Amino acid sequence: NRVYLINSTRDIAKLGITAENNPLAHKDLTAFFTETGDGAELYLLVMAQATLLSQMCSIEDGSPLKKLITYAKGRIRLVGFNRLPPAEYSADTTETGIDKDVVTAATAAQSVGDSFAKKVMPFRCLVPAAGWGGKTDKLYKPREGSTNRVGFVMACDDQVNKTAAVGQMLGRAAKYPVNYSLARVKSGVIATEGWLTNGETPEECDAMLDLLDEAGYIIYRSFPKKNGYYPNDDPMGAPLSDDYSNLNYGRVVDKAMIIAYTTFVEEIQDDIETDDDGNIPQEMCSYYEGRINNAVASAMQGEISNFTSYVDPAQNVLSTRLMT
């Protein structure tokens, strides 16, 4: 229940995490830093093995997710959840094809993410498509969901335990600019061998890959005459019509939001002139807009194609004590 800040594979060893005493944490942490290299900032919170994903993502005060985000004071932009359940655990897959608790967790994580975004602490999540038995009938389709802050990882980098490649996908996302898709081929091979969370290779599940892709799962794909696997895409649990249907779309907006906030917050409690109705002069609004636009353009070169801020002059800042 303690949060640790890890910056390298050396820190994994310092914490005493090994493939023997904590195979899931060791696997995901190693995969993350294999992608990013040493120096990346990763916050780790390890829970008891019996802890459900839905409990990790709970909207209740003091939940692991809320604890993690609060501890990092808004520095976390990507969150990955994974779980190696105890031997006696039996996943309920009757209605969803994957562990129903994963779907419940995604809904909770979405609510928590929305609440923190209002505090200018936005983040996106990846959850494991755990418990999948290899069948597609009744399979939950993230693309028909309403969790545009949460993606479902069905790619697996552990054939024995069938755990999702969450750390690996987080590392790929963290390594590159926010506008890059996980599926960008120029980013290189993400795995030389891999499976899906039913323990079978993509080749063994070839007849289902298109369906899984269309359903909105993050899986492995390969290309003729190219070795290894690449992510198929970075879908979130939302339809393609959603503005944040993919991870990179949401990450771009999150970064712009934070830059706009950190620029605008410098103006708090500064002295400004207002008209008789308490409204801000248009020239001051234009000044604020210019500062924000310039900050975003400077910090997000190549990551965003267009950005325009707007400060409404028709707002009584004297009575509301707010400026938007």
Task: Write out the residue ranges for each language-model feature.
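Short secondary-structure junctions and interdomain/linker hinges
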Residues: T36-A40, A215-I219, T263, E267, ...
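Long, contiguous, structured domain-core segments that constitute the functional module of a protein
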Residues: L170-M284
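A short glycine-rich, hydrophobically flanked beta-strand micro-motif that places a catalytic Asp/Glu
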Residues: S305-D312
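C-terminal edge-of-domain segments
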Residues: A314-T324
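Small-residue-rich
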Residues: N1-G133
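Short, hydrophobic/π-rich interface segment
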Residues: Q282-S305
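Conserved, well-structured core segments that form the ligand-binding/active-site neighborhood
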Residues: I76-M208
